[in-house]
Structures are given as structure tokens and as C-alpha cells.
């Protein structure tokens, strides 16, 4: 996002948090997230409306009036206020206005998970889903096929997820499938990282030769926390080709302690 859009999103996000905190119920936050996603779908199907509600050449009053005319009575009063607040801001492009609404919808759903004490579970489910999609290339291809209707692709993923994840995880994942400018694997993995950030944690991506148990993950999180000076979430996966040890990535920094990596460095030293 450009600077103006980042500023607009920060303002509306703060207002959204305040509104959800004032109500303090999980159901209201979940409804807000769902309705914001519904609004995004409407904007996706109406380019003229998408451009008009974020047209910076028009005054804010006109944009807010358009929001009221289109969505008044169709969404809850609290979501209508969020939409009016968003329309009042200056966004760099209509695309970034739409992206901002996606972020707001996600934020509302995550606040509902927070009120239920499910943030950690949602984070883990999203990360696991991103790894499943990475392994199941046929499924990912079907979910990414833009020649097929979004509704059909979402129905397919809903069948895969049914009864296996929280309602918040399912809602977030289904919405991600409809984002044509994003790879669903990367988008869902980034969502898991956003959940960690909401909990005040940074993410350590860990690849190991054998699966880490819960105690080992906790010990690794504590050790990395001491190294980096902040709380850490461990997103781990198994790659038997490492032979042993692990590879850790935190941001742009990579620590290769795998057996295969050590052997490769040893071979290079004799070259």
C-alpha cells in the first residue's frame, strides 16, 4: 500500500477496534467481519461502484453519501459506520480501498476469535492449511482456477475444511480464495503471520527432519525469544531431505543447522 492508504487503514482500523471493544461481544465482531467481506464481494462485481467510493477527486461527503445510499439497511449500523469512515479517508487507489476493507474484515474476525480465546488455534490452523495446499498441488490448482466461478471454488474448500477448523479460520480461508491478485498458499500463510502479530509475536519458520513435539516447539520459541528479544511463534514443517537438524527463518535471516546444509558446506570447502 502507498502512504496515503496505509494512513487511511490505520485510522479506520483504530476506529474499528474501538467500536468492537465498546460492544465486547464475539457475535458482533464475527458479524462485522462477515459483512465487510460481503461488501468486498459486491465491490468486486461492480467496477464503477468500486472506483466511485474511493474516488479522491470527489469530496468526502459525496463518497460517504454513496456508501449510505448503496449499503444503508443492507449491513449492520456498526459496519455502515466503518464503511462511511473508510470512504471519508483518502486512498491512493480503488484497489487499495478494496484491500483495506479486506484487512478490516479480517481484523474483525480475528477480534471475534480473540474474544473466544481462539487466536492461537486460528494461527495454527491457517499455517497448517497453507502447508496442506503447498503439498496438494491439484487442490491448489482447482482453488486458483480463475476460469471457474469464485462460489464453486469456495464451496470446494468449504467441503475440505468442514468440521476440521474453527468458524473464523474457515471464513478467512474462504475469503482468501476469492482474491485474484494473490496466491492462496502465500495469502493464507501471511494470514497466519498476521494472527501471530496480533498476539504480539514474530514468526519463526522452522523446517526440521523430524516433527517437533509441543515441548520442543515451546523450548525453541523461548530460545529464539531470548535471541531476538521478542515473543516468537513457531511455524514448523517436516522435510526429511534435511537428514537431521533444522533450518530457521526469522524475517530475512536464515539459520541453517541442518545435516544436509552442513554436508553441503563441507563439500564446498573441498571444492
From Swiss-Prot:
Entry keywords, A to Z: ATP synthesis, Cell membrane, CF(1), Hydrogen ion transport, Ion transport, Membrane, Transport
Keyword Ribonucleoprotein included in the entry's annotation: no
CC per GO annotation: plasma membrane; proton-transporting ATP synthase complex
Key word DNA repair present: no
Subcellular location: Cell membrane
MF-aspect GO terms: proton-transporting ATP synthase activity, rotational mechanism
Recorded topology in the membrane: Peripheral membrane protein
Lineage: superkingdom: Bacteria
Known role: F(1)F(0) ATP synthase produces ATP from ADP in the presence of a proton or sodium gradient. F-type ATPases consist of two structural domains, F(1) containing the extramembraneous catalytic core and F(0) containing the membrane proton channel, linked together by a central stalk and a peripheral stalk. During catalysis, ATP synthesis in the catalytic domain of F(1) is coupled via a rotary mechanism of the central stalk subunits to proton translocation. This protein is part of the stalk that links CF(0) to CF(1). It either transmits conformational changes from CF(0) to CF(1) or is implicated in proton conduction.
Family designation: Belongs to the ATPase delta chain family.
Assembly and interaction partners: F-type ATPases have 2 components, F(1) - the catalytic core - and F(0) - the membrane proton channel. F(1) has five subunits: alpha(3), beta(3), gamma(1), delta(1), epsilon(1). F(0) has three main subunits: a(1), b(2) and c(10-14). The alpha and beta chains form an alternating ring which encloses part of the gamma chain. F(1) is attached to F(0) by a central stalk formed by the gamma and epsilon chains, while a peripheral stalk is formed by the delta and b chains.
Record's protein name: ATP synthase subunit delta
Organism of this sequence: Corynebacterium glutamicum (strain ATCC 13032 / DSM 20300 / JCM 1318 / BCRC 11384 / CCUG 27702 / LMG 3730 / NBRC 12168 / NCIMB 10025 / NRRL B-2784 / 534)
Name of the encoding gene: atpH
Amino acid at each position: 500500500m502507498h502512504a496515503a492508504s496505509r494512513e487511511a487503514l490505520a485510522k479506520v482500523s483504530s476506529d474499528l477496534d474501538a467500536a468492537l471493544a465498546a460492544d465486547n461481544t464475539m457475535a458482533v465482531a464475527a458479524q462485522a467481519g462477515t459483512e465487510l467481506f460481503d461488501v468486498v464481494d459486491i465491490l468486486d462485481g461492480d467496477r464503477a461502484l468500486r472506483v466511485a467510493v474511493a474516488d479522491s477527486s470527489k469530496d468526502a461527503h459525496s463518497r460517504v453519501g454513496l456508501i449510505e445510499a448503496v449499503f444503508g439497511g443492507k449491513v449492520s449500523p456498526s459496519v455502515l459506520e466503518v464503511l462511511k469512515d473508510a470512504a471519508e479517508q483518502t486512498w491512493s487507489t480503488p484497489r487499495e480501498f478494496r484491500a483495506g476493507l479486506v484487512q478490516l474484515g479480517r481484523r474483525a474476525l480475528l477480534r471475534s476469535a480473540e474474544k473466544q480465546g481462539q487466536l492461537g488455534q486460528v494461527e495454527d490452523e491457517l499455517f497448517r492449511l497453507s502447508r496442506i495446499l503447498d503439498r496438494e498441488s491439484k487442490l491448489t490448482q482447482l482453488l486458483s482456477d480463475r476460469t471457474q466461478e469464485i462460489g464453486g471454488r469456495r464451496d470446494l474448500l468449504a467441503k475440505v475444511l468442514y468440521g476440521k477448523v474453527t468458524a473464523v479460520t474457515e471464513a478467512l480461508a474462504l475469503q482468501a480464495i476469492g482474491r485474484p491478485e494473490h496466491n492462496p498458499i502465500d495469502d493464507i500463510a501471511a494470514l497466519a503471520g498476521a494472527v501471530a502479530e496480533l498476539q504480539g509475536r514474530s514468526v519463526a519458520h522452522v523446517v526440521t527432519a523430524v516433527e517437533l513435539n509441543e515441548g520442543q516447539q515451546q523450548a525453541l520459541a523461548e530460545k529464539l525469544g531470548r535471541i531476538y528479544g521478542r515473543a516468537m511463534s513457531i511455524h514448523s514443517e517436516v522435510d526429511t531431505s534435511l537428514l537431521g537438524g533444522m533450518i530457521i527463518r526469522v524475517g530475512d535471516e536464515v539459520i541453517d543447522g541442518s545435516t544436509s546444509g552442513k554436508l553441503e558446506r563441507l563439500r564446498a570447502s573441498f571444492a
